[in-house]
Amino acid sequence: MGYPTPIKLGLSAPINVPLIYKTGEKMRYVAYKIYPEEFLNNEVVDNALIIEGRKVRRVRILGKVENINVGNIISFYVDGVNVRYFEEKPVYIEEGDIVDVIGRPRTYDGEKYIMAEIIRKRDERWIKLRDLEIKKTRKYLLERAELYEEENEEMSLEEEVYTEILNSDVIKDKILAIIENVGEITYEELAEKINIPEEDLEKYLSELKESGDIFEPRPGVYKVL
């Protein structure tokens, strides 16, 4: 049964999105785009989804919302994947919505789920686009995600930083999070908040506009769709 009105999940809160976290803080891993069935068909070990011998610590899935449950924990399913939302930033969703979810693989009482960080509503056109994106970016997952071994040691800080800087997806995620957090931002303000060369910032902004993630309500001003 669908919901007649959107459900509000949580209250607003700032998002901290530096390119590299300060010493002692946890690294923010790349959010790799995967199919929902890949989450369902693979193991979660040590808070990482194991795909083709790689440990994926942040995932991004697209699918249809069902079985929304609002209680002590807010949860719903996206094409069969259990998603749980603990953030305070408000999110409005209904049964049947197409949503784009970024989050971390977790398990509780033997059940796999995604601890959602960002949830965005999309439309049907995104399903075909996401299929193309996954095929295009899968090589990065296979080349750069952490290797899974039974007794694998943690990657060094230098390796984690190298992996994060190499992958443009994580930088675009940070740009999106900054814009989403402030609501509307000028190019100059954004350039101050994210420490990358201007030519790279212009390229990423152009790609985000082409993909429909952001738009310019006025020249040089950006908002999330």
Curated annotation (Swiss-Prot):
Pfam families: PCI. Transmembrane segments: none annotated. InterPro entries: NA-bd_OB-fold (IPR012340), PCI_dom (IPR000717), WH-like_DNA-bd_sf (IPR036388), WH_DNA-bd_sf (IPR036390). Residues 166-214 form the PCI domain. Gene3D superfamilies: Nucleic acid-binding proteins, Winged helix-like DNA-binding domain superfamily/Winged helix DNA-binding domain. It comes from Methanocaldococcus jannaschii (strain ATCC 43067 / DSM 2661 / JAL-1 / JCM 10045 / NBRC 100440). This is Uncharacterized protein MJ1654. The lineage of its organism: Archaea, Methanobacteriati, Methanobacteriota, Methanomada group, Methanococci.
